[in-house]
């Protein structure tokens, strides 16, 4: 685990003075439960803190970057940048899921790629960096991995609307979303959806809701139409999401 932590710190560009904070941020509740640890030893409290830090930093960034943007538009843009789907997208760039401490069941059922798990861990890492190195270091991490390439993230966030407009302009066939698979208990559902133009599949997506899975499928569909492949994303990594 020590080697993995060192590698992760190289990837994110921050060296922890207290590596235990990073381990804490990577500890999912399923792992803590499996070890019969106290609930405070999982990453949920750090996630809570990181969420607050992320909101402050992203708000400050938008306020100073888009000086003529009205409050309502800034609110919408911030929501698109810090929502669970986008955070899962950003976490996959690292890829953060590879470093998580998960319970065996969570790991076997795809927890390392589950959007809710990796997006929560992303916020927990922000919280850990804030505690270890202060607001400036947390800000640097957020700018590097979340507030970069905003236009691309906006495309992801608005993918269903954009794909609909593209298909209406270029094709005669109807755009259709089909549910491929639904699994998991009611409190932790997972959906897989494909999107088709007529009978031709152009993208697939996973998510905790059908709407979220459709969003990811639409994004992959846009990439397929524009670039001929369904996974042209930031740093060429596939994404999954949920909202």
Task: Please tell me what each predicted stretch does.
Residues 1-243:
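Double-stranded RNA-binding/processing signature
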């Amino acid at each position: 685990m020590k080697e993995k932590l060192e590698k992760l710190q190289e990837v994110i560009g921050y060296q922890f003075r207290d590596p235990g904070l990073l381990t804490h941020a990577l500890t999912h509740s399923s792992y803590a439960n499996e070890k019969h640890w106290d609930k405070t030893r999982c990453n949920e409290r750090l996630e809570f803190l990181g969420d607050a830090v992320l909101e402050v930093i992203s708000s400050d960034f938008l306020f100073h970057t888009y000086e003529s943007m009205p409050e309502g538009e800034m609110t919408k843009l911030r929501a698109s940048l810090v929502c669970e789907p986008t955070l899962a997208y950003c976490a996959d760039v690292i890829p953060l899921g590879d470093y998580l401490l998960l319970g065996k069941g969570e790991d076997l059922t795809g927890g390392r790629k589950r959007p809710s798990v990796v997006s929560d861990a992303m916020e927990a890492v922000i919280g850990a960096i804030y505690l270890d190195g202060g607001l400036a270091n947390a800000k640097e991490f957020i700018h590097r991995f979340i507030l970069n390439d905003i236009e691309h993230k906006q495309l992801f966030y608005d993918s269903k609307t954009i794909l609909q407009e593209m298909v209406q302009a270029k094709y005669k066939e109807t755009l259709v979303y089909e549910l491929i698979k639904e699994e998991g208990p009611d409190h932790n559902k997972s959906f897989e959806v494909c999107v088709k133009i007529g009978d031709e599949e152009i993208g697939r997506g996973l998510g905790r809701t059908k709407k979220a899975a459709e969003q990811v499928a639409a994004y992959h569909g846009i990439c397929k139409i524009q670039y001929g492949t369904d996974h042209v994303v930031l740093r060429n990594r596939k994404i999954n999401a949920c909202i």
